[in-house]
Amino acid sequence: MPRFKLTLEYDGSNYAGWQRQAELRTIQSALEQALFHFSGQQLTITTAGRTDAGVHATGQVAHVDFEKNWRTHTVRDALNAHLQKQGDNIAILHVQNVPDSFDARFSAIKRHYLFKILNRRSPPALNTKRVWWIPKPLNAQAMHEAAQKLVGKHDFTTFRSAHCQAKSPIRTLERLDVQREGEEIFLYAQARSFLHHQIRSFAGSLMEVGIGRWTTQDLEAALHAKDRTRCGMVAPPSGLYLTKVEY
């Protein structure tokens, strides 16, 4: 069966995450509904990253197997038409033929995430579900300097969900940069894979540094404690975006 790689974007605000769930609207269920209307087949789509409820994507990757070897632009345009008809905030950006050995999840060698913070006194009126609004002034430079203590290979028990199903809490974080652009602060994270709630836990803990409640040493101590209770708050999903997957 011909295998196709799909690159897509979506606004996760009104979805219960990626993974199919009974009686809940998810990204996977919406895509599989569109795939059925297009192909007449009950197909299963596999993704690089099963994003949580409220998390967005600008460069999510998935793969699906069809019985027919469709033209890639036909797949893209037909799926987009069905998604729009369904009222879904999902768009197929690119479609590519790939070998059977390609797996959107297991072939990935690097995942890139962005976390957006709106740092101003006034709340957002337009992007309420696409940023984390923090009215208190944040020191982005202090946040960036502290974030470098998290880069590298570590036991990230402190920064993963208590419900994380990963066998090991050890991950190698390749990048965690914090940059301010006007009223917005961007956190850029890069690794082969991440733990459940890891980036949102980073964002919440770095917020503590940004407002001056924590020092860099406090963040480092929280990391080495390997204790979930030492983590700062878990930032809301609204600010998180999966931006790119490398293979």
UniProtKB/Swiss-Prot annotation:
<keyword id="KW-0819">tRNA processing</keyword>
<feature type="active site" description="Nucleophile">
    <location>
        <position position="52"/>
    </location>
</feature>
<dbReference type="InterPro" id="IPR020095">
    <property type="entry name" value="PsdUridine_synth_TruA_C"/>
</dbReference>
<dbReference type="Pfam" id="PF01416">
    <property type="entry name" value="PseudoU_synth_1"/>
</dbReference>
<comment type="function">
    <text>Formation of pseudouridine at positions 38, 39 and 40 in the anticodon stem and loop of transfer RNAs.</text>
</comment>
<protein>
    <recommendedName>
        <fullName>tRNA pseudouridine synthase A</fullName>
        <ecNumber>5.4.99.12</ecNumber>
    </recommendedName>
</protein>
<comment type="subunit">
    <text>Homodimer.</text>
</comment>
<comment type="similarity">
    <text>Belongs to the tRNA pseudouridine synthase TruA family.</text>
</comment>
<dbReference type="InterPro" id="IPR020094">
    <property type="entry name" value="TruA/RsuA/RluB/E/F_N"/>
</dbReference>
<keyword id="KW-0413">Isomerase</keyword>
<feature type="binding site">
    <location>
        <position position="113"/>
    </location>
    <ligand>
        <name>substrate</name>
    </ligand>
</feature>
<dbReference type="InterPro" id="IPR020103">
    <property type="entry name" value="PsdUridine_synth_cat_dom_sf"/>
</dbReference>
<dbReference type="GO" id="GO:0003723">
    <property type="term" value="F:RNA binding"/>
</dbReference>
<dbReference type="GO" id="GO:0031119">
    <property type="term" value="P:tRNA pseudouridine synthesis"/>
</dbReference>
<dbReference type="InterPro" id="IPR020097">
    <property type="entry name" value="PsdUridine_synth_TruA_a/b_dom"/>
</dbReference>
<dbReference type="GO" id="GO:0160147">
    <property type="term" value="F:tRNA pseudouridine(38-40) synthase activity"/>
</dbReference>
<dbReference type="InterPro" id="IPR001406">
    <property type="entry name" value="PsdUridine_synth_TruA"/>
</dbReference>
